[in-house]
């Protein structure tokens, strides 16, 4: 009887040990995150960092066991990270291209897209600039090099050459104007400059009377105004018109209301591109961004 009890005890001990060792094993990927817990890093276009920081703070406050760490980069490098499976989530201003989708599927992946928001591409100028309205047509003339001086757009202007400044040569802003406004052609203005980040674009325009900067509208709000209705006072936000001749009556600034009712003409879709086989925290954060709480 004692011998049988001994065998039973040893057997139960072995079963318990095996169960414990199996439960301690991590997945082959090394990830242990769930839909609402764990730690991940994800890539995001740098131009969306003000939005992402706000959303991240709310998400981590709501889900105490979750930590999401953004890697701010440009659109091209962020997409490469996703394709190389160095991240499972990318926040950017375009969807997958067909060849990118196929590349991921050919390797046994199941990439998905979620539309999370809409953003205005803002045109900013020096705060002393009295020429505050511009048509999409004239902006295209600046991009393609047809208009290189302020007087080409505003006859009589004495501001000289237009200094056109973007955040980054590989950014979503550059991709948007080339794809949506220039029909896939490159920017041809000889006076175009890349300032590396959106913050540097704002700083450059604030110090350069003849500049036009192109940035995401989420960078414009005055941090002192909790209603988000006051733009940064160091620069002027230009009103943009869909019509051939811009006037104060037919031109609009990139307030959220004018973006959502389609009055403002330069609108980008913000996407969450996901390639997460675990359906873990990348999915949880992406769905939070599109939810009413995230909006």
Residue map of PLM features:
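Short alpha-helix boundary/capping motifs
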Residues: 87-89, 109-111, 232-234
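Conserved catalytic core of two-component sensor histidine kinases, primarily the HATPase_c ATP-binding
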Residues: 120
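Pocket-flanking alpha-helical
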Residues: 76-107, 223-225
């Amino acid at each position: 009887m004692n011998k049988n009890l001994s065998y039973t005890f040893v057997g139960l001990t072995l079963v318990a040990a095996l169960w414990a060792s199996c439960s301690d094993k991590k997945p082959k990927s090394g990830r242990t995150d769930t839909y609402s817990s764990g730690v991940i890093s994800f890539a995001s276009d740098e131009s969306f960092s003000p939005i992402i920081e706000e959303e991240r703070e709310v998400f981590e406050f709501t889900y105490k066991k979750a930590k999401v760490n953004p890697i701010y980069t440009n659109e091209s490098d962020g997409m490469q990270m996703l394709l190389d499976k160095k991240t499972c989530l990318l926040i950017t201003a375009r969807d997958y291209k067909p060849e990118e989708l196929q590349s991921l599927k050919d390797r046994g992946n199941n990439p998905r897209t979620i539309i999370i928001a809409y953003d205005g591409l803002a045109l900013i100028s020096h705060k002393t600039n009295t020429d505050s309205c511009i048509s999409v047509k004239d902006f295209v003339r600046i991009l393609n090099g047809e208009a290189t001086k302020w007087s080409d757009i505003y006859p009589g202007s004495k501001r000289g050459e237009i200094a056109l400044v973007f955040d980054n040569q590989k950014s979503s802003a550059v991709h948007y104007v080339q794809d949506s406004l220039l029909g896939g052609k490159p920017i041809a203005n000889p006076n175009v400059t890349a300032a590396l980040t959106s913050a540097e674009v704002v700083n450059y325009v604030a110090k350069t009377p003849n500049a036009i900067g192109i940035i995401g509208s989420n960078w414009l709000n005055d941090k002192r105004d909790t209603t988000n209705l006051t733009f940064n006072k160091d620069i002027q936000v230009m009103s943009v018109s869909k019509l051939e001749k811009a006037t104060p009556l037919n031109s609009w600034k990139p307030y959220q209301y004018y973006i959502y009712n389609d009055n403002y003409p330069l609108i980008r879709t913000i996407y969450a591109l996901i390639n997460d086989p675990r359906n873990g925290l990348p999915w949880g954060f992406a769905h939070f961004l599109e939810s009413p709480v995230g909006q």
